[in-house]
Amino acid sequence: MPVITLPDGSQRQFAHPVSPLDVARDIGPGLAKACIAGRVNGKLVDAVDVIEHDAQIAIITAKDEAGLEIIRHSCAHLLGHAIKQLWPQTKMAIGPVIDKGFYYDLDLDHTLTQDDLDLLEKRMHELAEKDYDVIKEKVSWQQARDAFVARGEDYKVAILDENIRRDDRPGLYHHEEYVDMCRGPHVPNMRFCHHFTLQKTSGAYWRGDSKNKMLLRIYGTAWGDKKQLNTYLQHLEEAAKRDHRKIGKQLDLYHMQEEAPGMVFWHNDGWTLFRELETFVRMKLKAYQYQEVKGPFMMDRVLWEKTGHWDNYAEHMFTTSSENREYCIKPMNCPGHVQIFNQGLKSYRDLPLRMAEFGSCHRNEPSGSLHGLMRVRGFTQDDAHIFCTEDQVRDEVNNCIKMVYDMYGTFGFEKILVKLSTRPEKRIGSNDVWGRAEQDLAAALTENGIAFEYQPGEGAFYGPKIEFTLLDCLDRAWQCGTVQLDFSLPGRLNASYVGENNERVVPVMIHRAILGSMERFIGILTEEYAGFYPTWLVPTQVVVMNITDNQSEYVAKLTEKLSAAGIRVKADLRNEKIGFKIREHTLRRVPYMLVCGDKEVEACKVAVRTRRGKDLGSIDVNEIITKLQHEIRSRNLHQLEE
C-alpha cells in the first residue's frame, strides 16, 4: 500500500500500486486530463509507470518546463511517424529535444523541398489530431534489436550495439504502427502534441563525425498551447529583423568571407563601435584597479603541454611551425598571464594582482558551427586573471560580481541568470579547499543580493565557477560572464609568491570574463538594440545637413565645432532633397540629424530630428552640444527624444 507524498506535503494512501496518472485522477479530473508525466522521488517517469512503494510525487503538466520538453520529445517521434508514412524507406537515427524545440536526424533517399516539409507537417497534424494513445513497452535488448533489424532501422541497431548494455531493458514507444526507442518519458496521448511547426532542415553527420554519412536533420518547435506557439513564432520573426548579420550589412559594420572563415573584416564604422566598447571596458578596468597587459598570440607547444591544453584541447587549436619548433596560436590568455606573473619575485604584499588583456584568440571551431559574430574562429576576449591568496578569494569574487553588474547595467541588461557550478567527481584539490571555495562564491553572491541556482558537479576539475547569463529583449539567453576559480594552472606553470612566513605559496587564480568575446557581445548588442545603439556607442552620433547651398559654410563650421567637442559627426552637403537625406540617415540609425536652413543660420541654431522620427524643434547650437556631450559622457541609454 504505497503512501504518496505530494509537493504541498499532503499524503494519499493507496491499496495497490499506482501510476502518476492514477494519483492525478485521485486528486481531480482536471489534473488527470492535464497529466503528462510524473516526477517520482526526483526522477521523471511516464504517466503510466507503476509506483509500488512509498514515494514523493509531482504531477507534470504542460505548464512545467519538464512538460514542455516531453511534448517536444514526443513531437520528434510524431515526425518519425509521419515521415515513415510518406517515405517508408527512411531510416531513423536520433531525435532529441533542444532549446525550445526538437530535431530528428534521418537517412532519406530523397531531397526534401519546402513543399515536402509542408506536406510532412500537414501529415503530423493529421496524426496528432487523432489523439491516439502512446503505448510504452519495456523489452529485452535482444527483442529491441530484433524489432529494429526487422524494420531495417540500421541506426537504431547501431545505437543498441554501441550504446546500450545487453542486460538493459530499452523502452519502445508505439505510435500506432510506428515504433521508436527512447528512455522517455513521453506524452500518454497525442492530444498534448497539437501546437507545433517544422522550421528548417540542415545536414548533420551521423554521430557528429565527418567520416560518417551525412544525414538530413529536420528542426521543429512545439509548445503547450497555441498562444505560446504564436508568441514564440512572433519572437522568431522579430529576431529575424534584428539579425546582427543583416543589420551589420545595412550599417556597413563588417563582413566575413570564405578566404578567412570565422574571421571578421571590420569596416570603419564597425571598428569605431568596437573601439568605443574597448574604451568603455578599459575605463572600468582602471576603476576596478586592473593592470592591462599584452601577451604574444602564439607560444611553443611545450607550454601548452604543461598547462594540459594540448591533451584536452588540441583539436581546437591552430598550430604552425618554424625552425623545427611547433607553436600554438593561443585559444585563451591564461597561460600567458601566468608567464607575466612569474617575472620577478612576488610577495603576499603584492597580492591581489589583477591582470587584464584584450586578448586576440583563435579557436578551430567546426565550419558548420560558425555564425556571424556569434560564433567565430578569431575573437578578442575581455579576459582577466586575478592572482590572490586563499583569504582574498571572497573579496575578489565580490569585486568581480560588482564589476559584472556595473557593466551589464550600462547596456540595459537587467534580467541576469546566475548559476554556481560545484565540485565534479574528478577534481584536484582537497575537499576542504573545494568546500571553502564554494562557500566563498556562494557568500559573495548572497552578499550582493543575487539569487542563483546550483549546478552540482558541473564545475571544472580545477575549481568551481559562477556563470552569468543575460536575457535579452526577446528572452533569449546569452551566457557571457564567468568567474572561475583555478587551483591547477598556477602550480602547473610554477607560479608562486613568498608568504608571510617566508615560504613559497602557489597563488589562487581567478579567471574572469564579463563580455566574453568582444565580437559576440557586439552581435548581442546589435540584436538587443536592433541597430539603434545608444548614442555613446554608435559610430556616427550626429549628421549635420543643409537644405540649400546657402548653408554649406555654416554646416562645415558647425561640423568642426561638434567634432572639437568630442562628438562623432558627419556633414551631408549633397545636392539632394532634405527629406531624402533624413530618410537615408534614419535608416543608418544615426541618433541625431541637425538640419540647417536660412532661419537656423540667422539665429545660430539647428533644427533637431531623431532617428525615431521625433522633431525636437529649433535648438541653440551651444545648447545641443552641451546636451549631446552629457548624453555621451553619462552613457545614458535614454536619448533626448525620450
Curated annotation (Swiss-Prot):
Binds 1 zinc ion per subunit. GO terms for molecular function: ATP binding; metal ion binding; threonine-tRNA ligase activity; tRNA binding. Its cofactor is Zn(2+). Zn(2+) binds at residues 334, 385, 511. Residues 1-61 form the TGS domain. Its main location: cytoplasm. GO terms for cellular component: cytosol. GO terms for biological process: threonyl-tRNA aminoacylation. It holds the Pfam family TGS. Keywords: Aminoacyl-tRNA synthetase, ATP-binding, Cytoplasm, Ligase, Metal-binding, Nucleotide-binding, Protein biosynthesis, RNA-binding, tRNA-binding, Zinc. InterPro entries: aa-tRNA-synt_IIb, aa-tRNA-synth_II, aa-tRNA-synth_II/BPL/LPL, Anticodon-bd, Anticodon-bd_dom_sf, Beta-grasp_dom_sf, TGS, TGS-like. It catalyses: tRNA(Thr) + L-threonine + ATP = L-threonyl-tRNA(Thr) + AMP + diphosphate + H(+). Its EC number is 6.1.1.3. Residues 243-534 are annotated as: Catalytic. It is found in: Cytoplasm. The keyword Aminoacyl-tRNA synthetase applies. It comes from the Bacteria. NCBIfam families: thrS. Catalyzes the attachment of threonine to tRNA(Thr) in a two-step reaction: L-threonine is first activated by ATP to form Thr-AMP and then transferred to the acceptor end of tRNA(Thr). Also edits incorrectly charged L-seryl-tRNA(Thr). Belongs to the class-II aminoacyl-tRNA synthetase family. PANTHER family: THREONINE--TRNA LIGASE, CHLOROPLASTIC_MITOCHONDRIAL 2 (PTHR11451:SF44), THREONINE-TRNA LIGASE (PTHR11451). Homodimer. This is Threonine--tRNA ligase. The lineage of its organism: Bacteria, Pseudomonadati, Pseudomonadota, Gammaproteobacteria, Enterobacterales.
